């Protein structure tokens, strides 16, 4: 034992304690991440324990493997056949096959769970409906693998500058008075003609209900949201107290899909999608602002949605024939103004010299997009540039907002070029 003790101290120090401490230090901001939905503190402990077991297994495997390869089984005489090498090669080969098979199975499972198949899903084109089906709702995630939360483990905490700390399990949370509300969400990175925008009917508990039960203290000015994937974001307490700001648990009459935040996500009308956090686990009242995940990457600082509109039909560089469309060429699209509603949509086919009012086929509410259409009769064959603009509920016409900067949501007018033949 005395001879082995120095070796044990060296191997455990180099291959166990040192990498464990370095990993905890480097990964500390991420250790509260929980794939199954543990609250942040238990998740941090479980992750640290998992790292310790992993590094201990690694250290023991290295030490015992080295000892197995270097220690002779016995000392044969010159005439005796020694099968040690053959046995060891057989054992190592078998272990290698097991490791390879296990690794391949793990990779297959990870590929099945990965978000690659749906991250960046867009919703646009000829099939756009007033209410977006759940499986076609736009989706953006920071995770390679999104959480799959066990509802029995999930808790929602209300902490910070409050009088009464609150903790809800899923049953208690869903027993609170709930409302249903149609709201459109849009990603801050959505281009003028892109489809990172969708509309759904949400059901959930007003965030104000949870905050009033906790009793905000003087000095509380911001609400910081914490999610099980370690995502955080912040918005003003005044917006959190708005009756339209929800903690939603249903989407279009169904439980929230995993990719959209099951069991609870926040819906904040008028703010870009990054503020509508998914997999919510803690609501913290603070006195100061704190940068969220995407804000740290440079997005912002303005997160309120500007007035936007889009042409879905016809497509860019579409070729059409006047002879085949005697009743005119149909134009269709959407208009959206955050939480201000859309009162009017107009189109131009002459570079903005004249604007014609489109028909609003689906008016929605002040929290949703509108669907519009217009029958266009080109005066002659040729190339045309079509564009659209919307007017919000306060009468403010869509415009280029240079002061917003490139990372606070692009502004301007969506334009498509089409060619009309005789």
State the predicted function of each range:
Residues 64-73:
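Membrane-interface capping segments at transmembrane-helix boundaries
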